[in-house]
From Swiss-Prot:
Major location category of this protein: plastid
Family designation: Belongs to the intron maturase 2 family. MatK subfamily.
Record's keyword annotation contains Plastid: yes
Keyword line: Chloroplast, mRNA processing, Plastid, RNA-binding, tRNA processing
InterPro entries: Domain_X, Maturase_MatK, Maturase_MatK_N
Designated name of the protein: Maturase K
Subcellular location: Plastid, Chloroplast
A Gene Ontology cellular-component term: chloroplast
Biological-process GO terms, alphabetical: mRNA processing; RNA splicing; tRNA processing
Coiled coil: none
Signal sequence interval, chain numbering: none
GO molecular function, one term: RNA binding
Listed HAMAP family: MatK
Length: 496
């Protein structure tokens, strides 16, 4: 009940556009701590217990209340290692608290506390990353061209702040955001590594503004034939009303409407990559490319080279997206028809959306996290040798389970078997190193127990989904499964 009350208090502050006082509340940092611990895991998260201890939070709030609290960020304090540590700690803690404040109205837990709970929960499955692939399986077979887009980054930090103006209307909060970005500008690289959630929020806010305007044009222009360009530009998202952009819309408004009236256009994005697919011709796709480059430059002051948008024909191109390599291939099919005394043999080609796992990319992530070398040979993890045997095995099994869970949609499972082999042998080498013995003797002593730990979870999940009596279902499993509870991807090296 107390937690729900806290979320409702956040909602009240959000609706009244007065967020800054929430930074002084202890429960904000408790929420940041809890969300850090409950993050979707491939590896265990560390350092959260020290970062958000009650003593540190109380001291931080006391310093914030003081009139000269920002003196802790003074450059002279960096000469003292103690103050330098506090500088990093306080800036990181405040920044994560700030992100909690502006993120919380969109969190699933907060949505559960609202009155319209049942209506909103119907769309929970659409939050899953895997929901993209069934959509592609249904739609992409009927499309001809695809544009791979690398979304450009803003060239100046002030552009990021300006992108937040219509979402965060509290001037004090925006000034605090500017303080973080410009005070820590000299050490922005190290600060961004320690505060990944903070910068991820800023980047997503920037992309949100871009997509809101872009999708508004995409969805609404077919209904705006009788609307003048002047009224069209008064929409709230066009706060940047640049003279050049107005001239473009005023002179070429009908042409732009014609460009956007494409019912066969599909748009998908994750992180900094997006896909624009269409049934139209190559000429239409090149017009989209020209429009996107000018749209970024004129509306968001973002310089983008045309090379960041590459157009390819789906029949001879593979999509590298979300850890999968997707392609449309043709399966030849011969059909024999009997007509009275004559028979005919007809050759048909059936399109199939094929999805496989990028084994090289997965091995690269494992090598980056020191589970193996670049060639895929398993390595031990000396940092975990101090843990108990059961804890070490449980950690490796968790990583293996999450990787298998995410890449279960692959039509070829051999790549996953290779990854499981690397993790299993890396686990065995870590345990052998701990007990100061060889891997061979350790596996001989442990027997099949280690293998069962890595396979039990997958077997339980498969048996729940597909009864063993159904051979057809097991054949479908070998083809691929999509889960609707996966909301993020973590690079294996991020938590090391």
């Amino acid at each position: 009940m107390e937690k729900s009350q806290g979320y409702l208090e956040l909602d009240k502050s959000w609706r009244h556009d007065f967020l800054y006082p929430l930074i002084f509340q202890e429960y904000i940092y408790a929420l940041a701590h809890e969300q850090g611990l409950n993050r979707s895991i491939l590896l265990e998260n560390t350092d959260h217990d020290n970062k958000y201890s009650s003593l540190i939070v109380k001291r931080l709030i006391t310093l914030i209340h003081q009139q000269n609290h920002f003196l802790i960020f003074d450059n002279d304090s960096n000469q003292n290692p103690f103050w330098k540590h506090n500088n990093n700690l306080y800036s990181q803690t405040i920044s994560e608290g700030f992100v909690i404040i502006v993120e919380i109205p969109f969190s699933p837990r907060f949505v559960d506390s609202l009155e319209e709970k049942k209506k909103i929960l119907k769309s929970n499955n659409l939050r899953s990353i895997h929901s993209i692939f069934p959509f592609l399986e249904d739609q992409i077979l009927h499309l001809n061209f695809v544009a791979n887009i690398l979304i450009p980054y803003p060239i100046h930090l002030e552009i990021v702040v300006q992108s937040l103006r219509y979402r965060v209307k509290d001037a004090s909060s925006l000034h605090l955001l500017r303080f973080f970005l410009f005070t820590l500008n000299k050490s922005i690289s190290s600060f961004s590594k320690r505060n990944q959630r903070f910068f991820l929020f800023l980047y997503n806010s920037h992309v949100y503004e871009y997509e809101s305007t872009f999708l508004f044009l995409r969805n609404k222009t077919s209904h705006l034939r009788s609307t003048s360009s002047g009224a069209f530009l008064e929409r709230i998202f066009f706060y940047g009303k640049i003279k050049h952009l107005i001239e473009v819309f005023a002179n070429d408004f009908q042409a732009i409407l014609w460009l956007f009236k494409d019912p066969f256009m599909h748009y998908v994005r994750y992180q900094g990559k997006s896909i624009l697919a269409s049934k139209r011709t190559s000429l239409r796709m090149n017009k989209w490319k020209y429009y996107l480059v000018n749209f970024w430059q004129c509306q968001f002051y973002v310089w983008s080279q045309p090379g960041r948008v590459s157009i390819n024909q789906l029949s001879n191109h593979s999509l590298d997206f979300l850890g999968y390599l997707s392609s449309v291939r043709r399966n030849p099919l011969a059909v024999r028809s009997q007509m009275l005394e004559n028979s005919f043999l007809t050759d048909n080609a059936i399109k199939k959306f094929d999805i496989i796992v990028l084994l090289i990319s997965l091995i690269g992530s494992l090598a980056k996290a020191k589970f193996c070398n670049v060639l895929g040979h398993p390595l031990s993890k000396p940092a975990r040798a101090d843990s108990s045997d059961s804890d070490i095995i449980e950690r490796f099994v968790r990583i293996c389970r999450n990787l298998s869970h995410y890449h279960s949609g692959s039509s070829k499972k051999k790549s996953l078997y290779r990854i499981k082999y690397i993790l299993r042998l890396s686990c065995a080498r870590t345990l052998a190193r701990k007990h100061k013995t060889t891997v061979r003797s350790f596996l001989k002593r442990l027997g099949s127990e280690l293998l069962e730990e890595f396979l039990t979870e997958d077997g339980q999940v498969i048996s729940l989904i597909f009864p063993r009596t159904s051979s057809t279902s097991w054949r479908l499993y070998r083809g691929g499964i999509w889960y609707l509870d996966i909301t993020c991807i973590n690079d294996l090296a991020n938590h090391e």
